């Protein structure tokens, strides 16, 4: 194993740290292709060693969800004009309570929404700047956080979940039309970034529930949300780009729709979703990104075995690490690589 190189962490911590560099028998990109297609991968990719990970705003120059604020709450305005408050304790942002919404009425979206500028020259410069940074590694996979999907953006512009869910019920046609136009915007945005930063995977965010149940019914999913989401996913995948779909909430009732949308990976809340039962039911048609939620060495190393055994038998599996302790993160990363190499070696040699 090489001494290690300093990489930039994007997520709940932005502290640079050293991670192992492994002498792999095939390229990171080839192994990822195999993982995405259940085609005999050799190890489990992880966010620290296999990916160049960026926030969308780094690549577009547009104000976007971010994790670079300090220890105090900070207000900020996103690319659509929504007002957010950075919450350091949560490691993320929430719509600012009492903030003025972009829209009071979703039926006004055609006249009142100001669509963000997709200036190609600005995006080109942002992508080139990102690729010039010392933490960017050409041999790694290009992976970025695309940002909010259909229902999250609807909620954001209307000022909250109550307003967003009421709009879905009271003005379904306007909501659907807005989400279709948002999808057209998203396709243009994706294509421009992909032109200047060939993209291996995006993370798409659309939270569909609380820890108790989904925000909306199967009928709303089928009539309003599914089609624009499917159009975007199909376009991204047609360009050879994988999708990691992050969706918070107890989304058991929506799993069939997620499988039909066919992202390579789902990133879901472990405490309210039984990933093992989903895997048992859908097999190779469903995949997962499982995040390490601890800096306890023994727990991280045990999880490196457990989740692979249960969820990654044939592929469609990777791990995200938001580490703040360099030594523990290093050891956990080594354990994941070494164990997964042994796991797949045994599987393919038997």
Which residues are covered by each model-predicted region?
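Short, surface-exposed, low-complexity cationic segments
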Residues: 38, 87-111
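Short acidic, Pro/Gly- and aromatic-enriched capping/linker segments at domain boundaries
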Residues: 58-76
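Short, basic/low-complexity N-terminal boundary segments at the transition from targeting/disordered tails
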Residues: 44-64
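Active-site loop segments of alpha/beta catalytic cores
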Residues: 1-51, 77, 111-350
């Amino acid at each position: 194993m090489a001494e290690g190189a300093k990489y930039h962490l994007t997520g709940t911590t932005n502290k640079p740290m050293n991670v192992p560099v492994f002498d792999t028998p095939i390229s990171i990109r080839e192994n990822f292709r195999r993982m995405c297609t259940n085609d005999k991968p050799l190890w489990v990719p992880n966010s620290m060693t296999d990916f160049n990970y960026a926030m969308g705003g780094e690549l577009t120059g547009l104000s976007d969800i971010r994790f670079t604020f300090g220890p105090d709450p900070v207000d900020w305005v996103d690319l659509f004009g929504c007002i957010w408050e950075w919450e350091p304790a949560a490691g993320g942002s929430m719509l600012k309570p009492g903030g003025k919404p972009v829209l009071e009425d979703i039926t006004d979206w055609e006249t009142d929404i100001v669509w963000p500028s997709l200036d190609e020259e600005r995006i080109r410069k942002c992508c080139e700047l990102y690729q010039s940074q010392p933490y960017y590694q050409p041999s790694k996979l290009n992976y970025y956080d695309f940002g909010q999907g259909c229902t999250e953006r609807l909620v954001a512009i209307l000022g909250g979940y109550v307003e967003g869910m009421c709009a879905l019920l009271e003005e379904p046609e306007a909501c659907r039309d807005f989400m279709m136009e948002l999808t057209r915007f998203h396709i243009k945005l994706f294509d421009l970034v992909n032109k200047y930063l060939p993209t291996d995977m995006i993370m798409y965010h659309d939270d569909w529930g609380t820890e108790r149940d989904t925000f909306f019914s199967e009928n709303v999913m089928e009539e309003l949300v599914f089609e624009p989401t499917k159009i975007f996913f199909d376009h991204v995948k047609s360009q050879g780009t994988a999708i990691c779909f992050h969706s918070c909430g107890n989304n058991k009732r929506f799993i069939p729709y997620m499988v039909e949308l066919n992202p390579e990976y789902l990133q879901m809340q472990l405490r309210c979703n039984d990933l093992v039962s989903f895997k048992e039911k859908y097999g190779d048609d469903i995949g997962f990104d499982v995040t390490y939620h601890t800096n306890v060495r023994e727990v991280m190393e045990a999880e490196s075995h457990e989740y692979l055994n249960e969820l990654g038998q044939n592929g469609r599996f990777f791990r995200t690490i938001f580490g703040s302790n360099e030594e523990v993160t290093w050891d956990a990363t080594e354990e994941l690589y070494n164990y997964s190499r042994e796991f797949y070696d045994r599987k393919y040699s038997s």
